[in-house]
Every structure is written in structure tokens, then in C-alpha cells.
């Protein structure tokens, strides 16, 4: 059985609705009774209750109430609920939600018991949240958030979280705090975490100024870490900037780095200066850089470096300089400290239209000075390349040349290499070639070519070899000859001749050979001619052999 009632809105009161339901179930013993009630007031209240009797050892019931109201700009919503099941669970909950302007708060409290303790609340859990967000007319924004959770049965889950955030045109700050454990709500609790970050921007039209900080604190783990970054940059009257990074761990500097840069360049001048400093438990670095480039003809750069802790290096200087004036070029590279010169390189160069000359010197901490020179000429009738290299105990000179004359027509090519070892005894390789026109007219043409080779190496060829050939054309007497001369080691001379001609209408060929070797196989002096004197097949062979006697 049941009933319901609807009361319309009147007299400033909202519409109200009520209903009740009762159900009985008879099975031979005590009847099982279920009762339910519902009350609803539009816009403000909603209530519900239900009970069950004669089914369990005791009466089971559940109730719920939801209320809403608003007064003086404050809106409130409340929720209450109870649940009881004999021998199983007993629960009571109370919730509250409030909003006033930019502030929102809510809370929830639950008391419960299980099994045999269902009638009496044995445990309790509660949670609450708070949120506030404000926006000012100046563009500032603020946010605050708080959260709490506490359980008597599981204390390790109890915690408190707080978040603050502030932001305006040139400033931003955020902080997060978390407290947990059995003493979560006490200021002396060591089981908490704090994280914060800050950013500032104080820049202007010709200024950039930034600051950033990050903090992490965990007292239980003995962790206190702080990171700070600062940057400043100026753009007028010249460019200058500096940046610094600092990392602290438990109050001690863990890592510190800083850099500065200045650019005072103008239209035709480049001038830079920079400094870098770094300090950590493992390594210390201090570096400075300077660049000076006033115009195209002068350049100078210097780097100074100091290392400490893991590697030790004190006042290392790296200097690079270049200078030019007319056809002259000069460059220097130096790497040194006050006690040691690690590297020194210098070079002087002359560059003209057909001339290149360069002189260089290299010295390091691992070897004494090494000098070198390169000379090159390039013209229509002469080309020369000379390379010279001198070390502490050895010296090398390499020369390649090409010469050409139009009158008398003569061409020379040569390659010379001279090596001086530790003993001071020079050893050289010479290779020369020459082609020369000795005579050229209407009746006589003569041309000579020569090749000379000298070397000190142990090879299956003579250490001195001269090969010379002379070609003669006598147009008046219709006589052509080729003479080949070979001289080995400056003493052993071999001469071979070949003559082709025509006399009185009779063509002839003559050949001769003269050598200084054993004449048992080939006579030392041999000559032979082949002559034709008719138009048929008749031939005459004239030969003469010389072996000391003609």
C-alpha cells in the first residue's frame, strides 16, 4: 500500500511532493515489511529513506538527503546518507559543496564499520578540496588549490596537497606541497615534498632580463635541490649578454656555469669578447675568447683555457693571427703556456702574378723546429717549383724546372732531389731532359736530345746514365743520320750511328757500333754499309771490322 501528495507552489514556497510505499510479505511467520519514503521540494530538497524488517537479524535501512540553498551570494549543497545492513556494513556519509565568488570548497566525511561492528562506526575517512581562482584588472592571475585525505584505518594513505600559482605580465610563480603519512597534518612532518618554480621577465626595448628558479625538497630523503638560471642581454649601444646557471644540492654548489659575450663591432670592424666559467665537483673550466678583425688584411683570435680537478691545465693560450700587405701574407698559430710551448706555426707568403713564395716553420713540444720553403715561378718560357724541408737532423730539397727558348729553340726539363741525413752526407737524385735545335737552314737541319739520370739508390740500373741522340738531315748531300750515345757511370761510353743517304743515284744505309766491353762476341768497333747500284737485284755489301786493327 502507499500514498502520494503534491502541494503546488504558493505563498513563496516551492512545489512539494511526498510519497510513501509499504509492502508486506507474509510467509507463515512474522511478515517481511519494506517501507519507503520520498520527499521532493523543487530546487531545494530531496529526501529518500527505505527500511526492511523481519528479514535479517535486525532492521536494515538506508536514508539519503540532498539540500541546496543560496543566500548572500553563497551557494551551498549538502548531502547526507546512512546505510545499515545487519552483520555486514554500517555507513554514514556527509558531504558539503560551497561556492562563493571565485572560491569553491567541498568536503566529504564517511564513517563506516564492517561485519560484526556494523552498529558502531569503527573507522572514518574524510576528504576536502578548496579551489580559488582570481583574475585582476591588471592582468594578474592567481590560483590556489588544496586537497586533504585522511583515513583512520590506513594512515599511510593520509595526505595533504597544496598548490599555489601566480602570474602577471612579468612574473610567474608556482608551488606544490605534498604532506603524507601518519603526521600528515603537522608542520613538523618530515614526510613531505615541496616543488616550486619562479620565472621573471624584466625586459625592455633594448634590454632582455630573465630569471628562472626551480626548487625540489624532500626532507625524508635528505634532498634539497635548487636550480637558478639568469640571463641578461643589452642591445644598445653594443651587444652584450651574460648567462649564469647555478645548481645547489643540500646547500652546496653542485654545478656553476657562467658565460659573457660582448660584440662591439662596427661597420668595418669585427670585435668580439667572450668568457666561459664552469665549476663542478669533477671539473673546473675557465675559458676566454677574443677576436679582433679591423679590416680584411688583419685578423687575430686568442683563446685562453684553464682546467682543474679531473684534468689540470693552467693558462693555455691558443693564438691565431693573419696579416697581409700588398702581395705579402703572414700567418701565425701558437699554442703555449707559461712553462711549455705545445705548438708554434708561422708562415710568410708572397703571391704575385707569376710568383709564389712561402716560408713556414713548425715547432711543438714533441719535436724541435721544422722549417719549410716553397718557391714557384710561372712564366711563358720558365716554370720552376722548389720545395725545401729541414728538420732537426734531416734536410730535403726538391726542385722541378722547365725552360724553353724560342731562338735558338731549346727546351729543358729537370727534377732534382737532395737528401741530407743525420750523418751530414748529401744524397741526391737528378733527372734532366733536354731537346735542342743545333742548326736549321735550307740545306742542313740538326737536332739533339739528351736524358741524364743520377741516383744513389741500390737498383738494378746504373747510378749514372746519360742517353744522347743527335739527328742530322743534310739536304744538299741527301744524307740523314742518327747518332745515339750512352754513357754509364761516367766511364762506359757506347756510340751507335745510323746513316741513310743516296749518292750518285745509289741509295745506301750505314750503321756503326762502338763500345768499351769485351769484343769476343761483338767487336768493339763495327761498321757496315748496304748499297744498291742498279735497278735490278744486284746489291753490294761493304763492311769493315775493327778489333784493334783496321
From Swiss-Prot:
Name of the molecule in the record: Putative uncharacterized protein LOC400499
Organism lineage: Eukaryota, Metazoa, Chordata, Craniata, Vertebrata
PANTHER family per the UniProt record, alphabetical: AGAP008810-PA (PTHR37860), VITELLOGENIN DOMAIN-CONTAINING PROTEIN (PTHR37860:SF2)
One Pfam family cited in the UniProt record for this chain: LOC400499
Taxonomy, superkingdom: Eukaryota
Cysteines paired by S-S bonds: none
InterPro entries, per database record: LOC400499-like
Amino acid at each position: 500500500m502507499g500514498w502520494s501528495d503534491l502541494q503546488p507552489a504558493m505563498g513563496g514556497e516551492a512545489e512539494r511532493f511526498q510519497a510513501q510505499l509499504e509492502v508486506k510479505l507474509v510467509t507463515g511467520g512474522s511478515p517481511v515489511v519494506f517501507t519507503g519514503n520520498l520527499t521532493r521540494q523543487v530546487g531545494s530538497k530531496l529526501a529518500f529513506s527505505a527500511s526492511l524488517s523481519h528479514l535479517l537479524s535486525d532492521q536494515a535501512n538506508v536514508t539519503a538527503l540532498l539540500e541546496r540553498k543560496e543566500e548572500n551570494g553563497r551557494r551551498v549543497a549538502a548531502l547526507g546518507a546512512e546505510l545499515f545492513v545487519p552483520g555486514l556494513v554500517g555507513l554514514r556519509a556527509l558531504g558539503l559543496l560551497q561556492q562563493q565568488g571565485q572560491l569553491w570548497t567541498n568536503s566529504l566525511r564517511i564513517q563506516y564499520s564492517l561485519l560484526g561492528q556494523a552498529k558502531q562506526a569503527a573507522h572514518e575517512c574524510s576528504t576536502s578540496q578548496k579551489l580559488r581562482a582570481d583574475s585582476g584588472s591588471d592582468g594578474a592571475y592567481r590560483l590556489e588549490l588544496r586537497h586533504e585525505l585522511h583515513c583512520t584505518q590506513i594512515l599511510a594513505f593520509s595526505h595533504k596537497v597544496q598548490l599555489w600559482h601566480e602570474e602577471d605580465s612579468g612574473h610567474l610563480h608556482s608551488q606544490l606541497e605534498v604532506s603524507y603519512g601518519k603526521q600528515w597534518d603537522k608542520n613538523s612532518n618530515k614526510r613531505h615534498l615541496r616543488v616550486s618554480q619562479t620565472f621573471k621577465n624584466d625586459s625592455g626595448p633594448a634590454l632582455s632580463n630573465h630569471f628562472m628558479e626551480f626548487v625540489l625538497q624532500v626532507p625524508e630523503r635528505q634532498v634539497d635541490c635548487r636550480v637558478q638560471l639568469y640571463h641578461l642581454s643589452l642591445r644598445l649601444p653594443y651587444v652584450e649578454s651574460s648567462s649564469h646557471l647555478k645548481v645547489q644540492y643540500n646547500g652546496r654548489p653542485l654545478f656553476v656555469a657562467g658565460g659573457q659575450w660582448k660584440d662591439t663591432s662596427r661597420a668595418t670592424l669585427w670585435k668580439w669578447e667572450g668568457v666561459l666559467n664552469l665549476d663542478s665537483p669533477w671539473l673546473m673550466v675557465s675559458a676566454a675568447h677574443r677576436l679582433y678583425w679591423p679590416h680584411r688584411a688583419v685578423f687575430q683570435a686568442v683563446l685562453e683555457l684553464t682546467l682543474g680537478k679531473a684534468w689540470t691545465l693552467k693558462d693555455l693560450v691558443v693564438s691565431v693571427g693573419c696579416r697581409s700587405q700588398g702581395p705579402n701574407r703572414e700567418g701565425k698559430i701558437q699554442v703555449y703556456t707559461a712553462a711549455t710551448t705545445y705548438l708554434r706555426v708561422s708562415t710568410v707568403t708572397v703571391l704575385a702574378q707569376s710568383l709564389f713564395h712561402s716560408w713556414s716553420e713548425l715547432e711543438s713540444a714533441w719535436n724541435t723546429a721544422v722549417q719549410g720553403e716553397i718557391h714557384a715561378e710561372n712564366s711563358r718560357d720558365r716554370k720552376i717549383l722548389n720545395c725545401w724541408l729541414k728538420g732537426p737532423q734531416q734536410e730535403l730539397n726538391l726542385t722541378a724546372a722547365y725552360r724553353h727558348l724560342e731562338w735558338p729553340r731549346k727546351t729543358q726539363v729537370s727534377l732534382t732531389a737532395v737528401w741530407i741525413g743525420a750523418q751530414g752526407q748529401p744524397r741526391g737524385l737528378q733527372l734532366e731532359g733536354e731537346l735542342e735545335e743545333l742548326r736549321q737552314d735550307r740545306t742542313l737541319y740538326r737536332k739533339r736530345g739528351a736524358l741524364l739520370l743520377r741516383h744513389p739508390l741500390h737498383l738494378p740500373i746504373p747510378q749514372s746514365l746519360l742517353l744522347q741522340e743527335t739527328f742530322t738531315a743534310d739536304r744538299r748531300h741527301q744524307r740523314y743520320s742518327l747518332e745515339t750515345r750512352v754513357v754509364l757511370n761516367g766511364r762506359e761510353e757506347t756510340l751507335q750511328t745510323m746513316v741513310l743517304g743516296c749518292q750518285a743515284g745509289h741509295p745506301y744505309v750505314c750503321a756503326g757500333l762502338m763500345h768499351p766491353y769485351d769484343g769476343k762476341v761483338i767487336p768493339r768497333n763495327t761498321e757496315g754499309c748496304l748499297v744498291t747500284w742498279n735497278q735490278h737485284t744486284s746489291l753490294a755489301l761493304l763492311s769493315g771490322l775493327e778489333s784493334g786493327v783496321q
